A protein has these predicted regions:
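Bacterial Sec-dependent signal peptides at the C-terminal "C-region" and cleavage site
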Residues: 1-10
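Mixed-charge, low-complexity segments
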Residues: 10-27, 42, 48-49, 54, ...
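Solvent-exposed helix/loop surface patches that form functional interfaces
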Residues: 11-35, 98-191
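N-terminal mature ectodomain segment of secretory-pathway/periplasmic proteins
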Residues: 28-111, 211-218
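Short, small/polar residue-rich loop motifs at catalytic or cofactor-binding pockets
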Residues: 63-65, 177-178, 199-201
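Hydrophobic alpha-helical segments, especially N-terminal targeting/anchoring helices
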Residues: 71, 184-185, 206-207
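Extended soluble regions of mature proteins
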Residues: 76-79, 189-228
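Short, low-complexity, Pro/Ser/Thr/Gly-rich segments in the mature regions of secreted, periplasmic
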Residues: 222-244
Length: 244
């Protein structure tokens, strides 16, 4: 029979609860010379999971990264996809799917060809796909009550310039240390952020429940990333204080 009026007016559950969009600037620590830019969209879904779409233009290195990450409500990776251009050439693309304690990766590149790899993964780990937008998620499983330097697990994806190496990853230990809360001001505004140190050499200022990176500094490389713009919509989006 014909659908009822009630059926016609039924609205399906929303796929998106909230969304953040922004851009980073990569610059030298010495004099602020522009090294690249990165744009992202962070989406909070109705099931509590989150996804990140990231476009990183590393113009100083002739590189361009297109990355998608999806994690569950506890920040455990579900799916990831990455396409890397390095040194002006297409390195390839990789698909990463997690089911239980297995991560299955498939890579295809013009030089490396088609390759696949299965990796056993722990209950708590993160994926390192290299855009700074996703780096805050490496801190999600840090236990602040325990404190100190903690060894977490990182699945690091190869984004190097060698086109013969596939876009596959390796499970590695990642040391993470919590350094306290700090107010930090960047072009996007002023944030009360949590400061972490990754691998003893990368300081991150992470903000809010979505673990958004506000600033990242790598002194050994002489590089800093700062959040330049931020816009949000949806539930429980906290807006930062704007610079005056």
């Amino acid at each position: 029979g014909l659908p009822t009026a009630a059926a016609d007016s039924a609205v399906p559950p929303a796929a998106i609860v909230a969304q953040l969009r922004g851009e980073y600037r990569s610059e030298t620590l010495a004099d602020g010379t522009l090294q690249g830019t990165e744009r992202f969209t962070l989406t909070r879904h109705s099931d509590g999971s989150r996804s990140l779409q990231m476009l990183a233009d590393l113009r100083s290195r002739g590189s361009w990264f297109n990355v998608y990450l999806h994690v569950d409500a506890d920040f455990r990776p579900v799916t990831a996809f990455a396409t890397y251009w390095t040194a002006g050439l297409l390195k390839g693309s990789g698909l990463f799917e997690i089911q239980g304690d297995a991560l299955r990766a498939t890579s295809r590149g013009p030089v490396s060809g088609a390759q696949s790899r299965a990796t056993a993964v722990p209950a708590r780990f993160s994926i390192g796909a290299h855009p700074v937008s996703g780096d805050g998620w490496h801190t999600a499983h840090y236990d602040r009550q325990t404190g100190g330097v903690q060894a977490l697990s990182l699945y690091s994806v190869d984004a190097g310039a060698d086109p013969s190496k596939p876009v596959l990853g390796t499970l590695l230990p990642l040391s993470v240390e919590y350094l306290g809360e700090e107010q930090v001001t960047v072009p996007a505004g002023t944030f009360m952020a949590q400061r972490f140190r990754l691998a003893g050499l990368n300081d991150l200022w992470v903000y809010g429940p979505d673990r958004l990176v506000v600033k990242s500094e790598l002194p050994r490389r002489g590089i800093r990333y700062v959040l330049v713009t931020l816009a949000g919509e949806g539930e429980a989006i906290e807006q930062p204080k704007q610079q005056r």
